[in-house]
Amino acid sequence: MTDDVTNVEQPSTASEQQPQDVPAAEPSAAKKRRANKAKSKATAAAIEQRLGHSFADPSLLTTAFTHVSALKSARRTDSYQRLEFLGDHVLGLIVSDMLYRAFPDADEGELSKRLADLVRKETCADVARSLDLVEGIKLGTVGAGAGAKLRKSVLGDICEAVIGAIYLDGGYEAASDFVRRNWTERMRKPARSLRDPKTVLQEWAQARGLPTPVYREVERTGPHHDPQFRVAVILPGLEPAEGLGGSKRAAEKVAASAMLAREGVGTGGNDG
């Protein structure tokens, strides 16, 4: 008699089971990058709202906030420095136009003093703080370690770079709107509170161990009854700055104001 053998299917071992499709966990580095990207986008949107300008080219805004210390490469042109250069001159033009229209009775000496005070680094830094632009500054360990976020020079640079970025993105009118919104009240500062630019420049030079500034007449043009003087102010280690005026003294003041503005020194108080 043959024994009946019952074929019973044995359960498969774990090694024989087919793996189920389980979503792979996102790598922590990728999650961090995605979170940082979302945060940067939100920060940029908030800054645009405070600036009153929506960028068609967001890369301009990013560059305007990038300190050279944040760059991994040696390409300094990827930092805000080029935009700062442009913004400095755009700001000077717009503020000069504002002053010319607002003070029709002021001579070139007074206008120059006001201009130097309004475009100095400290004023730009004050605008940057009022708009909370420090939030978007991108710094490397070098800058952050030195507290660069809070340094007046960095904030002033950022403000000028933002003006340059707005100018490139939206043109002169967009840049002018931004400057007028943020400089009109500052422009109304009483002129008597502004110090003589030649005195300020001399004190600034002496504080840095430099000799007394030298003023040299470069040229004299125009008729005898209405001459125009071009004067250069010279300090060792610095590029000369020039000024025009109806008298040598007026031209010297303009030249001193030009050097002060370039070096980020104002005439409204004590600058370090």
Swiss-Prot record:
InterPro entries the record matches: dsRBD_dom, RNase_III, RNase_III_dom, RNase_III_sf
Keyword Ribosomal protein: no
Sample GO molecular function, one term: rRNA binding
EC number: 3.1.26.3
UniProt keyword Hydrolase, yes or no: yes
GO cellular component: cytoplasm
Domain DRBM: 196-265
Subcellular location field: Cytoplasm
Main localisation: cytoplasm
SMART domains: DSRM, RIBOc
Positions of region (Disordered): 1-38
Domain of life where this protein originates: Bacteria
Polar residues bias locations: 1-20
Cofactors, names only: Mg(2+)
A Pfam family hit: Ribonucleas_3_3
Residues binding Mg(2+): E84, D157, E160
Sorted UniProt keywords: Cytoplasm, Endonuclease, Hydrolase, Magnesium, Metal-binding, mRNA processing, Nuclease, RNA-binding, rRNA processing, rRNA-binding, tRNA processing
Catalytic activity: Endonucleolytic cleavage to 5'-phosphomonoester
Residue ranges annotated for the RNase III domain, each copy included: 44-171
Top-level EC class: hydrolase
GO biological process terms, semicolon-separated: mRNA processing; regulation of gene expression; rRNA processing; tRNA processing
UniProt similarity note: Belongs to the ribonuclease III family.
NCBIfam families documented for this protein: RNaseIII
Quaternary structure note: Homodimer.
Name by which UniProt lists this protein: Ribonuclease 3
Gene giving rise to this polypeptide: rnc
